[in-house]
Regions:
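Internal helix-loop-helix
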Residues: 59-60, 90-163, 167, 210-212, ...
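A short core secondary-structure module
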Residues: 199, 203-245
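A structural-propensity feature for long, helix-poor, extended segments
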Residues: 154-160, 439, 445-487
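Extended, charge-enriched "interface" segments that sit outside catalytic cores
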Residues: 1-81, 85
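A glycine-rich, basic-preceded beta-loop-alpha segment at the flavin cofactor/substrate interface
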Residues: 241-244, 248, 260-292, 309-326, ...
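Alpha-helix capping/hinge segments and adjacent helical runs
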Residues: 2-5, 9-10, 17-19, 256, ...
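C-terminal helix-coil-helix/basic helical segment that borders enzyme active sites and/or dimer interfaces
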Residues: 343-394, 490-504, 523-531
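C-terminal amphipathic alpha-helical interaction region
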Residues: 454, 466-568
Length: 568
């Protein structure tokens, strides 16, 4: 049977990135748990070996159970009866296997029953699971909501909720409402404090809630009477054991059928405040969403990998005109670009995850003791890098998942349009990735300030100073010219001093920055392991160079007066 970890050597390469040593030192607090927990690592090598073993177990479960159940789960789906969700039979089997393997609460401290894993190896597990079944990946990976409760909840909440998640209970984040989608400041679910009950009571409706009948919910609700903006919103914890929330219906979706997307009705549902009042949206949901966006980036890479695998296997097997179709330039061109996008997107994903790991670990240490000046500087640096890279990782990988799924079907030809092949499920599942947890357009809104304030170009110029192998030098020379075009395009838009023009060109500028950054990451990877990455470095740079040229040409030739032609 396939192992979704060991079959992909690129994952082990990213696990062994040199930055992991610093991440492990911070996460393990210099390996202080070794005297208290027999499964805690003794040193860096022991920690990475532990991550590797858990990833191998995840890959085995994914290959033997989750992938095997994927088609059946897609067809059966979950059901709603008497206000409750019943998972598909295959989903129950998947969850049971993951719980028995101890793959829940992975990033939580060991004192709560977690594995104390950094974000990076956990994200690899999320990618692996999504490659087999993106719908199940949603249910399982929502465990990362516990990060927000851990970060902002109190000690009592930690002791009551975190061990339950580590033991396999599920989570959801209840944000969206019928009239509050991307515009979350419009949330109107009402939270009223009851002196009689000594808790908050929630009333209203939530919509499009992934895994909406979860055991533990993080809920965004309006706690401040008379407010209508984000400052009136707080974050609450709802425990299903308390009752008061019913599933009105499960949405009939295009894809991710295994994941129940629910409409929820709150009727005096007892809940407790998480953190401080009024900070629900402006602080806690922003942290929650950044974690979710990294998760969707991982899901997208998993889907890209699945699409590439299916396309490659079919192209090798299918014969036309006396030879396998993979031998035709039109087909091997598509496959090479699919692999280039996959490798580039994965490099961006794990670079982002490593940035998140360092600043999150330092944040956690700061709750125990005062950081040194050097640590504060390190925390600030990596928090900024994580904030700037997250919208790129989510935005680009979700678009690439869709593009790779599209090309996978194209490689299959007429067979790809039939329901018998997995490519149709991958295509349907991929479509949501560029929509939920913030559309690509909203990722552009998040990213554009890092274009205009010079963060991306500064990172790119820093990457230019990193030595590369002699074989990669010609690519680096071309890449520097691409960066010059990006910088010139950015300056041209900024000098126009027109906000509407900036908003209009933002997507192009974001993609230019992302393409150049991903090329740098691939060149760095190919310099260390040419066997794995040299081909993709060449293919992706050719692709990205044309994309940057296209966007630069558009911006150079565009007159802001032409905006009128685009408006209805």
């Amino acid at each position: 049977m396939a192992n979704y970890y060991t079959d992909i050597p690129e994952l082990k390469f990213h696990l062994n990135n040199p930055i992991m040593k610093r991440i492990c030192e911070l996460k393990e607090r210099n390996y202080r748990d070794k005297d208290e927990f027999d499964y805690a690592p003794l040193d860096f090598e022991d920690a990475v070996d532990s991550y590797d073993k858990v990833l191998e177990i995840t890959g085995e479960i994914t290959g033997e159970i989750i992938a095997a159940n994927a088609e059946g789960v897609d067809e059966e789906g979950p059901h709603c009866a008497n206000g409750r969700v019943e998972y598909a039979s295959g989903t129950k089997q998947n969850l049971d296997a993951m719980v028995k393997a101890g793959l829940n609460g992975m990033t939580m401290p060991r004192k709560f029953g977690g594995l104390n894993f950094p974000i990076t190896p956990y994200t690899m597990c999320a990618e692996i699971v999504a490659a087999a079944d993106a719908g199940f990946g949603n249910i399982w990976s929502l465990q990362d909501c516990i990060e927000t409760l851990y970060e902002f909840g109190n000690a009592d909440q930690h002791s009551r909720f975190i061990p339950r998640v580590c033991q396999g209970e599920t989570m959801s984040m209840d944000l969206t409402e019928p009239d509050a989608g991307s515009d979350l400041q419009s949330v109107m679910l009402k939270a009223t404090y009851s002196e009689k009950d000594g808790c908050w009571l929630l009333n209203g409706v939530k919509r499009f809630i992934t895994n909406g009948d979860a055991d533990i919910h993080l809920v965004l609700a309006r706690s401040e009477e008379g407010t209508r903006d984000g400052r009136g919103l707080s974050m609450f914890i709802y425990d299903k054991r308390q009752g008061g929330v019913n599933v009105r219906r499960i949405e009939n979706k295009l894809g991710i059928h295994g994941s129940p997307t629910c409409e929820l009705v709150y009727k005096n549902a007892k809940a407790e405040l998480c953190g401080d009042r009024k900070l629900g949206l402006i602080k806690y949901v922003m942290a929650l969403m950044n974690g979710a966006r990294l998760g969707i980036a991982a899901q997208s890479v998993g889907l890209s990998q699945a699409a590439y695998n299916e396309g490659l296997a079919y192209a090798k097997d299918r014969k036309q005109f006396g030879k396998a179709i993979i031998e035709f330039p039109a087909v091997y061109d598509m496959l090479a670009i699919m692999k280039g996008k996959l490798d580039a997107g994965r490099a961006l994903l794990y670079q982002t995850a490593r940035y998140v790991d360092i600043y999150k670990a330092l944040d956690d240490i700061a709750r125990e003791r005062k950081l040194t000046p050097e640590e504060r500087q390190e925390q600030k640096k990596y928090a900024k890098l994580a904030d700037s890279f997250t919208p790129l990782a989510k935005g680009m990988n979700s678009e690439y998942a869709n593009q790779n799924a599209y090309d996978c079907i194209q490689i299959h030809g007429g067979s790809g349009f039939m329901m018998e092949y997995a490519c149709q499920r991958i295509y349907r599942d991929a479509r949501i990735t560029s929509i939920y947890e913030g559309t690509t357009q909203l990722q552009t809104v998040a990213a554009i300030r890092y274009v205009t304030n010079g963060s991306y170009i500064a990172t790119i110029r820093e990457f230019e100073t990193i030595p590369c192998s002699p074989e990669m030098e010609p690519l680096m020379s071309r890449l520097k010219k691409m960066a010059n075009k990006f910088e010139a395009s950015t300056n041209a838009v900024k000098e126009a001093q027109d906000q509407e023009l900036l908003d209009f060109t933002a997507r192009r500028l974001m993609e230019m920055a992302a393409d150049i950054i991903m090329c740098h990451l691939l060149i760095q990877d190919a310099s260390k392991n040419p066997e794995l990455f040299a081909k993709s470095a060449h293919v992706y740079l050719n692709y990205a160079e044309a994309e940057v040229e296209k966007h630069a040409g558009f911006i150079e030739n565009f007159d802001k007066e032409d905006l009128a032609f685009y408006k209805k």
